[in-house]
Amino acid sequence: MALFKKNYDRHTHMHGKAGNATLSRSHAGNFCVFLFLLIVGAFMALPLVYTLVQSIKPTEELFTYPPKFYVKNPTFDNFKQAFQLAGNLWVPFTRYLFNSVFIAVVGTSVYILVASLAAYPMAKAKRLPGMAFLSQLIVWTLLFRTEVTAIPQYVVIAKLGMVNTYWSILLPALAGTFGVFLMRQFMVSAIPDAILEAARIDGANEYKIFWRISMPCVKPAWMTLIIFTFQSLWSATGGTYIYEESMRMLPNVLSQIAAGGIARTGAGSAVAVIIMIPPIIVFLISQSSVMETMAQSGIK
C-alpha cells in the first residue's frame, strides 16, 4: 500500500510539473502573439497618427527633417486654412459634402438590401434550379479586379446616359458581389432551416420570414458590410464618370487643396483628418458586430 502511494505521488508530481510547463509555454506563446500583433497594429496606425500630427503642426514644424511624430506647439491654424480654402472653391464646400453623404448613405442602405435579397435564395432556396451554379458564379466574380471591369462599366454607364449623375457611382456599387457572398455564407450557417420551416408552418410568408427572422439572425454580417460599403463609397471620387464640378465628391476637395503645393501641406492634412472622421465613427459604432462576425467565422 505504501509503495502504491509512493508511486502515485511521484506520478502526480511529474504530471503536475508537465502541466505547469505546458501552462507556462501557453502563456509565453500568447504573450509573443500579443506582442507581434501589437507591433503590427502600431505600424498600421502610424500613417493615421502622422496625418493627425501633421494637421496640428505649425508651419515651422511641418518641414523639419527628419519628420517628427509629435508636435511641440499644436495649433488649429491648418483647419482654419482648410475651411478658408474650401470657401474659395468654384463650388461651395457644402455641395461636396452633400454629394458624399448622399452617395455613402443611400448607396450603403440600398446595397445592404440588394445583397441580402440576392443572398437569401442562394442560401435557403436550395431546391430552385441553378442556385448552386449561381453561388459559384458569385465566387468567380471576386477573382476579377476593379480595373478589369472598368472599361465595360463605363461603356454601360455611357450607353444608359448616366454619366454626370449619381447613378454612375451607385449602379456599379450596387452590382458588387462581395456583399452577396458575405451574406450568403453567413445565412447558410447562422439561420437554421428548422426555424424557417417552423415559421412557414405557423403561417408566416417569405416576406415576414426574411425581415423578422433572417435579417436579425445575420445582423453581425450586414453591420460588417455597412462598414466596408460606407468606407468604399465615402472615399469614391467619381473621376471616371463625373465631370461636372457640382457633382464631385468630398475627396476632390483634398486633391484641389493639395494641388496648391507644399504651402498647403498642413491644410491638406487637416482635410484628410476631416474626411477620415465619418468612417471611423461608423466603425466604432459597429465594432462589436464586426468582432462577432470574425469570431463566428473562426468557429465555422
Please name every model-derived segment.
Residues 2-300:
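A hydrophobic, multi-pass inner-membrane permease signature
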